[in-house]
Amino acid sequence: MLALFFSLAPLLSQALPLGYTAAPAESFYFWPENISSLQAGEIFRKRELLTLPDIFDFGPNLEKVVQVAYKTRLTDGNDSFSIASIFIPKNPSPELKLYSYQTFEDAVQLDCAPSYALEVGNKSSNYLPVTSNLSAISRELEKGRHCIIPDHEGYISGFFAGRQEGYAGLDGIRAARNYLNGTNETPIGIFGYSGGAQATAWIVDLHDEYAPDLNFVGTVSGGTLVDAWGTFQYIDYPKVYLKGSILIMYTGLFSGYPAQFEVIWPYIEPVIQENMLLLRLAPNDCNQSPILQGYNNSIMAGIHVDLPEFPASKYIFQHESLLANYSVVPVSTPKFPRYMYHGGSDELAKLSLVEQYVDQQWNTGANLTFVVYPGLLHDETAYRGFDAAMDWLDAQLDSGYLPPVNSTHT
């Protein structure tokens, strides 16, 4: 059974890359034969979307959408690839400026990827989550900026595998910049909330080491998950009603570490194993509503190891933390301006973990604005904080600098 799980992603990427969905452009997602000879972010395939679903109304501001397939890497260093969707403005600004939006895919199937949802619309069951906040794209197109939505989970659909998302996101931005004939000086702003914020946070963390050629002038993340084990402690047992979402997080996270996952697998209860496979195999089922019906325990209770101490899982958690006191990999403090916002009563992303991360970043010289919306839950904060965050990012792209405000309240 485990062999089937691990073989699924490469199998789909070469033969049935979109969870068996019969899409006219299936071959666009096939594995390239020459990937080992490509550079990170190098484009090996591209296409123009001839139509967009009816929900997208970009008015007179959108010229076209181009999708590019590019090389990236997995957490273990092996070659990988992903897709980036590039929105070309009708009236581009004189200076090329890029805006990258990491949407919340929050799924572990390839046919849940943003690029596919943009192509097929509601034929993808992840269509609405992926496209729920494209007003930001419209806003930037109106300003003449080129916009990017990378498939930051990559072809392994590694939701919650932060390092995997960071590499795929950085290479997607790099691929878009190269497609648009940008340079190392091209100004770039990035934005993500919730699952997209986690990807954004890892893009930020890995930037200096992996992609210092990208000129980030401002980054925004809201409702950010900064520590995998701390997140599971916060939501797994006390919020058993979220068990489907939690299992998706375990499945995506462990998929980013196949060697360690293989060690953990025999200790996972059969019902959870079966549902992990179902998450991967059920065609075009991104919402996962039937997952774990009748199972009323926490997921961690169904994994019969001491997760924070068992060597394989401990390795994963210590590599999937942005907290300097827990991560075994140095956490970076980039010098470009950043903005983070969070709900004071966020039920998914624990505020105290984010505050700990922010304090550590401030103590090491970060240029970081942090805003907390007292009493607001996760989804409420997404909408309440959006305009202020985008205003900040627009100012960064306009002027290239805003002084930090080390604020912990609105």
Curated annotation (Swiss-Prot):
Pfam families: LIP
Protein localization: Secreted
UniProt name for this protein: Lactone esterase
Glycosylation, residue list: 34, 78, 122, 133, 181, 296, 325, 367, 406
Gene Ontology terms describing biological process: lipid catabolic process
Gene: sble
Molecular function GO labels: triacylglycerol lipase activity
Residues annotated as signal peptide: 1-15
Annotated active site: 194, 346, 378
